[in-house]
């Protein structure tokens, strides 16, 4: 295969395949940011919200004390697993206000997310198919920026997955000269 001179990536731009994946990833990252803040446009039938309310009442949980973890347990118990990614939205419907980020913080997070694409491609294990977990990445970027008030709101990975992702994240941080903070 020959590269036509114009198709050669310059030192300023990553190869086209990285750009393509980065474009898809940044859109997914923005979607995760929206879900996290319950800004998503999703429809959850009223009867599902009512069933969740009944379960909360049955378990004698005060709504202000409803955690993401407990909400996930309730969804699982009710067979509503497909709504896991909408937990913040569901809690908002129950009267629990979601965490809100400033537009400036969102923009900063998106820019940092774009910054990690080339180092990720460089250090990604060859047997790895997917990108880093998006909530893990959002957690690490907020941690890096000192935005610790958001950290308790992110669903975290199981221990082994954290270790695997931390190994890649450490290499990315080293490459970008960012502080690496171990997750465990």
Task: Please tell me what each predicted stretch does.
Residues 1-184:
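Non-catalytic, interaction-prone regions of core transcription and DNA-replication machinery
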């Amino acid at each position: 295969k020959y590269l036509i001179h114009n198709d050669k990536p310059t030192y300023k731009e990553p190869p086209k395949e990285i750009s393509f994946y980065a474009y898809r990833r940044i859109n997914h990252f923005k979607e995760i940011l929206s879900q996290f803040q319950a800004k998503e446009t999703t429809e959850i039938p009223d009867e599902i919200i009512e069933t969740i309310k009944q379960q909360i009442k049955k378990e004698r949980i005060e709504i202000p004390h409803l955690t993401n973890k407990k909400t996930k347990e309730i969804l699982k118990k009710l067979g509503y697993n497909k709504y896991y990614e909408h937990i913040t939205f569901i809690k908002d419907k129950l009267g629990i206000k979601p965490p809100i980020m400033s537009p400036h913080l969102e923009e900063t997070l998106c820019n940092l997310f774009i910054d990690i694409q080339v180092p990720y491609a460089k250090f990604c294990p060859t047997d790895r198919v997917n990108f880093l977990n998006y909530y893990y990445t959002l957690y690490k970027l907020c941690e890096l920026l000192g935005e610790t008030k958001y950290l308790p709101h992110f669903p975290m990975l199981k221990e082994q997955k954290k270790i695997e992702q931390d190994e890649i994240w450490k290499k990315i941080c080293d490459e970008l000269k960012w502080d690496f903070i171990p997750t465990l």
